[in-house]
Amino acid sequence: NNYCKIKCRSGIHTLCKFGISTKPNCGKNVVKASGLTKAEKLEILKQHNEFRQKVARGLETRGKPGPQPPAKSMNTLVWNDELAQIAQVWAGQCDYGHDVCRNTAKYSVGQNIAENGSTAASFASVSNMVQMWADEVKNYQYGSTKNKLIEVGHYTQMVWAKTKEIGCGSIKYIENGWHRHYLVCNYGPAGNIGNEPIYERK
């Protein structure tokens, strides 16, 4: 497939390595749900855009210190099925972590991941998992060089002003009695680029 032609310094493209099928590849784990429902997709998109607007308007009071400054401009994200397919193929490997290459012919692609495990017979909702990313704003100091990506990187990708598109994948499975929900969201163009600001302040 053409994804084998997309080169990343870090390794082979996810869809070159695993193919384009979104069928789960989870070994002995019992898969309960693979892929997002239409409602979950809409929820993820709505949650991202509402949060981006909140930050852009200067209404986010949290931070280190808060509040976060308003933004000069912030793209409204739209759903992209290609980004979602790449995310779904990766989520379907049931292997928590970032894949090494997920770019498209159009742009480099950023990624947020979350996993929730519970011994209760239920799975965490996508909105709870996206909220965990947004909540990292409490550790973020705008304009500082001391922010650590490990503490704020999900937040900064969520509100990266120049990102235009998002596509996500999800798998819910049972592993040794644990109900695990693994969510992967891909973003294009990628955020968290070098020393670029997450957005220009107003």
Swiss-Prot record:
PROSITE patterns: CRISP_1, CRISP_2. Keywords: Allergen, Disulfide bond, Secreted. It is found in: Secreted. Disulfide bonds join C4-C16, C8-C101, C26-C94, C168-C185. InterPro entries: Allrgn_V5/Tpx1_CS, CAP_dom, CAP_sf, CRISP-related, V5_allergen-like. Residues 46-187 form the SCP domain. One of its GO terms (cellular component) is extracellular region. It comes from the Eukaryota. Expressed by the venom gland. PANTHER family: CYSTEINE-RICH SECRETORY PROTEIN-RELATED. Belongs to the CRISP family. Venom allergen 5-like subfamily. This is Venom allergen 5. It comes from Vespa mandarinia (Asian giant hornet).
